Regions:
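A structural motif
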Residues: 37-38
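Short conserved micro-motifs at the rims of enzyme active sites and ligand-binding pockets
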Residues: 29, 99-100, 153-156
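Aromatic- and acidic-residue-enriched carbohydrate-binding clefts of CAZyme catalytic domains
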Residues: 1-20, 28-31, 47-63
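Active-site-proximal helices and loops of the catalytic beta/alpha 8
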Residues: 5, 45-149, 165-169
Length: 171
Protein backbone atom coordinates (compact mmCIF):
# COMPACT_ATOMS: atom_id res chain seq x y z
CA UNK A 1 0.00 0.00 0.00
CA UNK A 2 1.27 3.44 -0.89
CA UNK A 3 1.15 5.60 2.26
CA UNK A 4 1.58 8.85 0.31
CA UNK A 5 -0.74 8.85 -2.71
CA UNK A 6 0.04 12.43 -3.73
CA UNK A 7 3.45 11.53 -5.14
CA UNK A 8 3.09 7.95 -6.33
CA UNK A 9 0.97 7.22 -9.37
CA UNK A 10 0.53 3.53 -8.68
CA UNK A 11 -0.85 1.63 -5.71
CA UNK A 12 2.31 -0.48 -5.68
CA UNK A 13 5.09 0.64 -3.39
CA UNK A 14 8.07 -1.05 -1.77
CA UNK A 15 7.88 -1.54 1.96
CA UNK A 16 11.43 -0.43 2.80
CA UNK A 17 11.06 -1.56 6.41
CA UNK A 18 10.67 -5.16 5.22
CA UNK A 19 13.84 -7.24 5.62
CA UNK A 20 13.14 -8.84 2.24
CA UNK A 21 12.92 -5.46 0.52
CA UNK A 22 16.10 -4.24 2.19
CA UNK A 23 17.95 -7.41 1.15
CA UNK A 24 16.66 -7.00 -2.42
CA UNK A 25 17.74 -3.35 -2.66
CA UNK A 26 21.16 -4.01 -1.12
CA UNK A 27 21.74 -6.99 -3.40
CA UNK A 28 20.94 -4.82 -6.43
CA UNK A 29 23.17 -1.98 -5.23
CA UNK A 30 26.05 -4.43 -4.83
CA UNK A 31 25.42 -5.94 -8.25
CA UNK A 32 25.45 -2.55 -9.97
CA UNK A 33 28.62 -1.46 -8.17
CA UNK A 34 30.46 -4.73 -8.85
CA UNK A 35 29.28 -5.33 -12.40
CA UNK A 36 29.20 -1.85 -13.88
CA UNK A 37 31.74 -0.13 -11.61
CA UNK A 38 29.51 2.90 -11.23
CA UNK A 39 30.65 5.70 -8.95
CA UNK A 40 27.48 6.08 -6.92
CA UNK A 41 23.73 6.39 -6.81
CA UNK A 42 21.08 9.07 -6.82
CA UNK A 43 17.92 7.93 -5.09
CA UNK A 44 14.76 9.70 -6.21
CA UNK A 45 12.06 10.72 -3.71
CA UNK A 46 13.62 9.14 -0.62
CA UNK A 47 11.08 11.05 1.43
CA UNK A 48 8.73 8.31 0.21
CA UNK A 49 10.77 5.48 1.78
CA UNK A 50 8.27 5.34 4.64
CA UNK A 51 5.34 3.25 5.75
CA UNK A 52 3.67 6.11 7.63
CA UNK A 53 0.28 7.16 6.34
CA UNK A 54 0.50 10.83 5.42
CA UNK A 55 -2.00 13.39 4.23
CA UNK A 56 0.29 16.20 3.09
CA UNK A 57 3.81 17.48 2.61
CA UNK A 58 4.28 18.48 6.25
CA UNK A 59 3.32 15.00 7.47
CA UNK A 60 5.50 13.31 4.87
CA UNK A 61 8.50 15.55 5.67
CA UNK A 62 8.18 15.02 9.44
CA UNK A 63 11.00 13.09 11.06
CA UNK A 64 10.56 9.34 10.62
CA UNK A 65 13.21 7.32 12.50
CA UNK A 66 12.37 4.16 10.52
CA UNK A 67 13.00 5.97 7.22
CA UNK A 68 16.29 7.41 8.50
CA UNK A 69 17.37 3.93 9.57
CA UNK A 70 16.57 2.43 6.16
CA UNK A 71 18.40 5.19 4.29
CA UNK A 72 21.47 4.82 6.51
CA UNK A 73 21.39 1.08 5.93
CA UNK A 74 21.33 1.53 2.14
CA UNK A 75 24.14 4.09 2.37
CA UNK A 76 26.24 1.72 4.49
CA UNK A 77 25.57 -1.12 2.02
CA UNK A 78 26.94 1.02 -0.82
CA UNK A 79 30.00 2.07 1.19
CA UNK A 80 30.70 -1.55 2.19
CA UNK A 81 31.10 -2.42 -1.49
CA UNK A 82 32.80 0.75 -2.71
CA UNK A 83 34.11 3.11 -0.07
CA UNK A 84 34.45 6.10 -2.41
CA UNK A 85 30.99 5.74 -4.00
CA UNK A 86 28.81 8.83 -3.78
CA UNK A 87 25.23 8.57 -2.53
CA UNK A 88 22.85 11.41 -3.34
CA UNK A 89 19.22 11.57 -2.32
CA UNK A 90 16.27 13.68 -3.39
CA UNK A 91 14.88 13.94 0.11
CA UNK A 92 13.38 17.34 1.05
CA UNK A 93 13.06 16.64 4.78
CA UNK A 94 15.26 19.27 6.41
CA UNK A 95 15.71 17.67 9.84
CA UNK A 96 16.50 14.27 8.38
CA UNK A 97 18.84 15.81 5.81
CA UNK A 98 20.91 17.24 8.64
CA UNK A 99 21.10 13.84 10.34
CA UNK A 100 21.91 11.96 7.15
CA UNK A 101 24.43 14.55 5.94
CA UNK A 102 26.56 13.90 9.01
CA UNK A 103 26.79 10.29 7.77
CA UNK A 104 28.17 11.51 4.43
CA UNK A 105 25.05 11.38 2.28
CA UNK A 106 24.62 14.15 -0.32
CA UNK A 107 21.34 15.85 -1.18
CA UNK A 108 19.87 16.95 -4.47
CA UNK A 109 19.26 20.70 -4.37
CA UNK A 110 16.97 22.25 -6.96
CA UNK A 111 18.75 25.28 -8.40
CA UNK A 112 16.84 25.32 -11.71
CA UNK A 113 15.45 28.82 -11.30
CA UNK A 114 18.83 30.30 -10.36
CA UNK A 115 20.61 28.54 -13.22
CA UNK A 116 17.98 29.68 -15.71
CA UNK A 117 18.07 33.28 -14.50
CA UNK A 118 21.85 33.28 -14.74
CA UNK A 119 21.85 31.64 -18.20
CA UNK A 120 19.35 34.24 -19.43
CA UNK A 121 21.57 37.04 -18.16
CA UNK A 122 19.21 38.23 -15.43
CA UNK A 123 20.89 39.07 -12.14
CA UNK A 124 17.63 39.04 -10.17
CA UNK A 125 17.00 35.61 -8.65
CA UNK A 126 20.26 34.17 -10.00
CA UNK A 127 21.40 33.56 -6.44
CA UNK A 128 23.18 30.27 -5.74
CA UNK A 129 23.32 30.67 -1.97
CA UNK A 130 20.79 27.84 -1.63
CA UNK A 131 23.72 25.48 -2.16
CA UNK A 132 25.33 26.71 1.04
CA UNK A 133 23.74 26.27 4.42
CA UNK A 134 25.93 27.16 7.38
CA UNK A 135 23.51 25.53 9.83
CA UNK A 136 24.30 21.99 8.67
CA UNK A 137 26.93 19.99 6.80
CA UNK A 138 27.42 21.20 3.24
CA UNK A 139 26.37 18.08 1.39
CA UNK A 140 24.33 19.60 -1.44
CA UNK A 141 24.55 18.71 -5.11
CA UNK A 142 22.97 21.57 -7.04
CA UNK A 143 21.33 20.73 -10.32
CA UNK A 144 20.34 22.82 -13.28
CA UNK A 145 17.88 20.40 -14.86
CA UNK A 146 16.39 17.00 -14.12
CA UNK A 147 13.36 14.94 -15.06
CA UNK A 148 11.35 17.32 -12.85
CA UNK A 149 12.99 20.62 -13.84
CA UNK A 150 13.96 21.46 -17.40
CA UNK A 151 13.94 23.94 -20.28
CA UNK A 152 16.81 26.21 -19.28
CA UNK A 153 18.10 26.49 -22.88
CA UNK A 154 14.57 27.18 -24.15
CA UNK A 155 14.13 29.96 -21.59
CA UNK A 156 17.49 31.43 -22.61
CA UNK A 157 16.38 31.67 -26.24
CA UNK A 158 12.88 32.92 -25.43
CA UNK A 159 13.58 35.28 -22.53
CA UNK A 160 17.32 35.94 -22.58
CA UNK A 161 18.75 39.37 -21.87
CA UNK A 162 20.12 41.06 -24.99
CA UNK A 163 22.63 39.04 -27.02
CA UNK A 164 22.15 35.98 -24.80
CA UNK A 165 18.77 35.58 -26.44
CA UNK A 166 19.92 35.75 -30.04
CA UNK A 167 23.69 35.15 -30.30
CA UNK A 168 24.88 31.60 -29.75
CA UNK A 169 28.52 32.68 -29.32
CA UNK A 170 27.49 35.00 -26.46
CA UNK A 171 25.79 32.19 -24.58
Amino acid sequence: VTPHQKYVFSPDDFNHTSEQTKAFVKRNLKYLLDTYHIDGFRFDFTKGFTQKQTTGDDDLAATDPARVSVLKEYYEAVKAVKEDAMVTMEHFCANEETTLATEGIHFWRNMNHSYCQSAMGWKDNSDFSGLYDTTRPNQFVGYMESHDEERCAYKQIEYGNGALKTNLSER
